[in-house]
């Protein structure tokens, strides 16, 4: 009887570990260009995943991420918006305009059908941050006299 209890406890521990490791799927997959966008909780694993994604975006000399189509999850994670904010001095006028349009459309995207599953708090935080980033990008565009 005792051996069976130990076996059940071991099985439960292994299953729990498996669930923990898959909670933020793709954490250890560096090849996924969208990694860091869908893991939205504040667990250490998700925070690390978002940080890794942001570092990869900032290291991209071609800034190919600027033209990627964002998802509501990407807006909610804040990764793309942080990247636009961090690189605003280096972006071309065209890239700044693209970033501003993306930030301006974030609130609508977050509240749309693809944003289902996001909490009201996530939507609110991401919408406020997007508005802040939009203002910063607009200020940068005016300072450089970029055409809207």
Task: Name each model feature, range by range.
Residues 20-23:
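C-terminal motif of bacterial Sec signal peptides marking the signal peptidase cleavage site
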